[in-house]
Amino acid sequence: MFQDISNFYKDKTILVTGGTGSIGKEIVKTLLKFNPKTIRVLDINETALFELEHELNSEKIRCFIGDVRDKDRLKRAIEEVDVVFHAAALKHVPLCEYNPFEAVKTNVIGTQNLIEVAMDEEVEKFITISTDKAVNPVNVMGATKLLAERLTISANLYKGKRKTAFSVVRFGNVLNSRGSILPLLKEQIKKGGPVTLTHPDMTRFIMSINEAVKLVLKACYLAKGGEIFILKMPSVRIKDLIEVVIEELAPKYGYKPEDIEIKIIGKRPGEKLYEELIIEEEIYNLEELEDMFVVYPYGVDGNKNNKIIYNSKDAKFLNKEKIKKILKEISYL
């Protein structure tokens, strides 16, 4: 299948929004290996675009300074594009709680803008990058990403005779991405602690950036329109993750692990104790593949399997040895 996926992207013109973020940047770097015609990277961060252009040093990269809120800019960016990966978003839960209007403008209106210009341009495939926080959301960020998902899936119903296939990829927590827990832990341990833990019972689904990008590129290749693709992911207790990181990193920075305090600070605004990958209603339209779940559009039956565990508190937790192994695989330890 790898060769089929590689061939799919060959000679394509591809647009990646949010292309300087952790996921977007890795999508761009991986796509370059498949010999596309052009990759257009749209981002609001001028400095990050400049750095990306110099890092990749490829004539296939075109950097577009722009915001998904600006529909006119999107019209220019999407001209003659074959495939869209929509990774631009406001993603930090507490910041979105305090800036809800801004979250709506980017995550909802921005997604609508991009869908509409993609439809008019009749791009071949359109993938929205979503999050497990969109499942039964309790915070602004999750609610806006739920709307982004629904807008994307619903676009298949109102596109008329246009050919674009709109689909969604739903992620768990991406390890060592910008703003995630791992970079924060490293900084706290460097300073001798304390290391902050919001709640001792908190659990999360985790995945590496490489796993995330593989899922996105495979999902886009498979997409027919209307599907939600979800990577199968392990779950961790955040407390276990923190203890492993302290045990491994404290000696590297001249501290004894037992001297690094773990300070309980309480849940942040909008934060859940556990995450969910799939809502109950989606199970009836769900198919389980080797490495992912696929939720099909309403009215399309998947394999009915009511035994699927779809929240991080009931999933089997990684033990500390396996956590350590994963952290070494992503070159964090």
Swiss-Prot record:
Alphabetical list of PANTHER family matching this protein: UDP-N-ACETYLGLUCOSAMINE 4,6-DEHYDRATASE (PTHR43318), UDP-N-ACETYLGLUCOSAMINE 4,6-DEHYDRATASE (INVERTING) (PTHR43318:SF2)
Pfam families assigned to the protein according to its UniProt record, in alphabetical order: Polysacc_synt_2
UniProt similarity note: Belongs to the polysaccharide synthase family.
Alphabetical list of InterPro entries matching this protein: NAD(P)-bd_dom_sf (IPR036291), Polysac_CapD-like (IPR003869), Polysaccharide_Synthase-Rel (IPR051203)
UniProt protein name: Uncharacterized membrane protein MJ1061
